Every structure is written in C-alpha cells, then in structure tokens.
C-alpha cells in the first residue's frame, strides 16, 4: 500500500525502499555488463540472386549480413547452416531477408513415384509397392495407393523413402 508522506508525495512502505535500491543496482549491472557490450550484432541471410520456388538452396546462393534495422520482425533466417539444402516455397529476392516460413524440407517421396509400403504389427511385417498421392518430406503423414490392390492407406514417410503404414 502507498502512504502519503508529509511533503505530499506518494511513498512506499519503509521496507520497499531497500528493495528498490537492489532492483536499481541489478538493472545497472545488467546494462553495464561487459557481456552486453561485447554482444555481436544480429545477422540475417539474404540471397545474392533471385531464387525461384522449388529451387534447392546452397551456400553459394546466399550471404550473411548484419541486421541494421532494429524494427525487423523475428522469423527470419540467421545463419546459412539453417537453410543449406532446403527448398524455397516462394520467390526470394536479392537483398531481402529470408523468412523461415518461405522454406521447406526437400521431399523424400514425390507424387506418382513407386515406394515401398511397410506394415508392422507385433512380429508380422508386410511389405508392398505403393504410389504416393502427394509429395511429402520425412515425417509427414500421407495417403498412398497400394499398387497391387488399389486400396488407399495412410502412412508416415521415413528417411529411407519407405512409408510405414498406420494401423486402422
């Protein structure tokens, strides 16, 4: 609670005064710390040339620059390691920051190709040929048509381009 002092100013209780001094000292030490003074400016990755949707990114197409705009919103790529090998979803213009939402992982399976379906249930393993009904990256849940029977099943794309079928 606040109390009015005889001078007319609002004053906090006597116990809060030392707490205010400790808070001020902590804020001053954070602002004046050598770590804050030595912190590197933020960086961003920008394209050197126009990159069109579907192109695979590599380090030769990109460069890292210091961010000079303090109002730049978060969500942009900060290092080339984050994007090396990814594929663009939309056109990237030279000199503009690359948003993480404009990139995707490279597809492990493509629509219409032939893949191996694997179904595991306990000790039983069944494999069959399948055809994905959509493009998908590793870890995506997609629908696949069994080439032999025509039955459509759902499964998860694995790193070796097989699809592990989900039990119904």
Swiss-Prot record:
GO terms for biological process: bacterial-type flagellum assembly. The keyword Signal applies. Keywords: Bacterial flagellum biogenesis, Periplasm, Signal. One of its GO terms (cellular component) is periplasmic space. Residues 1-28 form the signal peptide. It is found in: Periplasm. Its main location: periplasm. Belongs to the FlgA family. This is Flagellar protein FlgA. It comes from Rhizobium meliloti (strain 1021). The lineage of its organism: Bacteria, Pseudomonadati, Pseudomonadota, Alphaproteobacteria, Hyphomicrobiales.
């Amino acid at each position: 609670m606040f109390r009015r002092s005889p001078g007319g100013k609002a004053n906090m209780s006597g116990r809060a005064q030392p707490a205010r001094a400790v808070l001020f000292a902590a804020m001053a030490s954070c602002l004046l710390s050598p770590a804050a003074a030595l912190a590197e400016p933020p960086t961003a990755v920008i394209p050197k040339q126009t990159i069109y949707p579907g192109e695979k990114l590599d380090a030769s197409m990109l460069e890292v620059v210091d961010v000079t705009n303090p109002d730049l919103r978060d969500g942009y790529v900060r290092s080339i390691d984050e994007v090396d090998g990814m594929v663009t979803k939309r056109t990237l213009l030279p000199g503009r920051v690359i948003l993480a939402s404009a990139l995707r992982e490279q597809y492990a399976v493509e629509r219409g190709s032939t893949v191996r379906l694997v179904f595991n249930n306990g000790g039983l393993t069944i494999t069959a040929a399948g055809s994905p009904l959509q493009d998908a990256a590793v870890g995506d849940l997609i629908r696949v048509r069994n080439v032999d029977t025509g039955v459509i099943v759902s499964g998860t794309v694995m790193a070796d381009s097989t699809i592990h079928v989900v039990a119904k």
